[in-house]
Amino acid sequence: MKPLIATSLVSPQRAGPGLAMPSLSLVACALMVLVAAGTALVNSYYLLLMTFAAIYMVAAMGLNLLTGYAGIVSIAHGALVCVGTYATAIASVRYGWGFWPSAVLSASVGLGFSVVLGLPALRLSSWYFVLITIAFTLAVTAMLNDLRGFTGGYGGIVGIPKPSLAGVRFDGFGLFALVGGVAALLWWVMHNLIDSRIGWALQSIREGDVRARANGVSTARLRLFAFAFSGAVAGLAGAFYASAKGVVTPEDFSFDFSIFFLFVVVLGGPARLSGPMLGVAAFYVLPELLDSLKEYRMIAYGVGLLAFSVFLPEGLAGAIARFDDRRQARRATSPAATLPRDAGAATVEPVRGMALAIRGLAKDFGGVRALDGVSLDVQPGSIHAIVGPNGSGKTTLLNMISGFYPASAGSILLDGAEVVGRGPTSIARLGVQRTFQTPKLLGELSLLENVRFGAYARERSSGLEIAFRLPRARHEAAALDAEALRLLALVGLAGRAHEHAALLPHGQQRLVEIARALIGRPKLLLLDEPAAGLSMGELDELGDLMRTIRRMGTTLIMVEHHIELVASIANTVTVLDQGRILAEGTPEQVFSSAAVVHAYTGGAR
C-alpha cells in the first residue's frame, strides 16, 4: 500500500493553531471516520486501505507537531517510520519478541534517531536542516540494502506477526480498529498539548523565538521535545505498518515516502488538528480509490497541487476553518463588547518590586557605540521612565536588561544579583517581564490564550500531566484561566476574551501584551513605548493602569515618547542622548532642563 505522491513542494502560509476544532472540520472528520469504518467492511482491499490510512494519519500527526506547530520542516519523517518498521520486523522475526515490546522498541528507536537528527537544528538555519534530513533519508534508504544481514536486503523480512492482547489476535477489522483507537488517543493527546503552554510556546517559536524567550521558554529544550515526540510517533506508526503489511522490503521506503508525509501535513492543513486526517483522505485514500483512472491520476494530482498552492495556501483544514469563521461571524447578532477597565479586577497576590542597579553599561554594534557608560538606579515599586530622542539607546537598554543583547562593558544588578551574561529565558525566570515596540501576540490564539501564555514559567504541571489531563494540570489550567480573565478585565477586554488577537486594533493589542506580562507576576516590568498608537482616552486609561500595577508592588521601567504621560505617572525620569545619560530626576526637574529641551529640539548640548 505505497502512497502515490507528487514530486513538487508547495510552501504554505502560516496556518491557524486549531486549538478548538471548528464545527465544520469536526463534522468533516466525523463523517470520514464513519465512511472509513463502513468502507473497511466492504471487502479485504478496502479494509487494508483504511488500515494503512489510519497508520499514515498517526505518523502525520507526529510530523504536524514538528512542522505545523513548531515550524521545523523535516523531510526525514518517512525514514523514521522506516526505522520503526524495521525495528519491529527484526525484533519480532529474528529475536522472537512480541508485538508490544517491539512497538516500544520502534518508538524508542524513532525517538532516538529524531533527537540526534534534531541537535543540529538548534544551531543551523532551517534550510540547512532540511538538507540534513534529506541526507538522513537517503542514508537510511541505502543502508536497507547495505545491511542485508539485519534487513534482509532486497528480499526484506517476512512473517511479521499481528498484535495480540490477552489472547485476542488483532487481524483484519480488529487491526483496523486497534490502529484507529491509537489514532484517536493520539489526537486527544495532541489536542491537550496544543491547548496548553507547550502548544502556545511551540507556535511562539515558529513565529520567532523572541516572544517565547521573553516568557521564560527554553526554546532549545522545547524544540528537542518536538523532535522526540514526532520521532516516537513515527516509530510507533512504523510498528503498525510492519504488522499490517506482514512483509517489509526496501522498496516500501523510497525517498518519495518521506515527501508524502510532508505533503499530507502541508496540504491537509499545518498546525490544524484535523489536517492529518484531511490530508491522508485527500492524498492517499482518494488517489487509491481512483485507481481505475490511473492513466489520468498524476495529471489530476499535479493540477490539484497547483490549485492548492494558489487558492488554499493554508491547506484543507485551514480553508474549512476560514469558511466556518465567516459563517459564524455572519450569524453573530452583535459585536463583542469592550468593557470598561476594572481596576479592582486583578486580585493577584502583591509582589515585591525588584531593585535595578546599572553601572558603566556600554554596548557596541561594530564600530558604533549605542550605549556609553550608562549608570542608573531604579527603586523597587517605582515607575522609572527612560526618554530621549530617536536613536538615543533607549530600546537597546531594555534589550540589555532583559538579556537579549550582551553587554560590551559594565554591570546589571537585579536585587543585587549580576545578570550580565545571562540570556532572556534565565532573566525572565527571575521575575522580569517585558513588552515590545510592536506587540508580539499570537494572532490566531484568543486573547485569553495569549494572556495564559504569559504564565509559562509559573506553571508546574509536567508535560505528561498536560498530555493526559491529569488532575493537577486541569486544576492549574482552570485557576490560570480565571486569573487571565481577571487581567483582561483590568485592561477592559474581558468581553473579547475568546476573540482572535489578530482582530484587535493596535492599541488594544498593547493592552493584551501588558496583561500577558502581568500574569507572570513580574517583580520588574519593562515597557517599550506602551503609549504608541493610543488615543487620548486610551492614554488616560494606560496611565491609570500603570498606577494600578505600581500599587501591586511591581517595579516599572518604561521607554516612552509621550512626555505628558511620563510627567503624570513617573517617579523618576532618565534622559538618554547619543547613548549617554543627559539628565535624571523627577519629571519636573528633567523637563525643565535646558539641556533636555535642546536635545529634543535639535539644539546644541
Which residues does each predicted region cover?
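Transmembrane alpha-helices and adjacent helix-loop boundaries
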Residues: 2-336
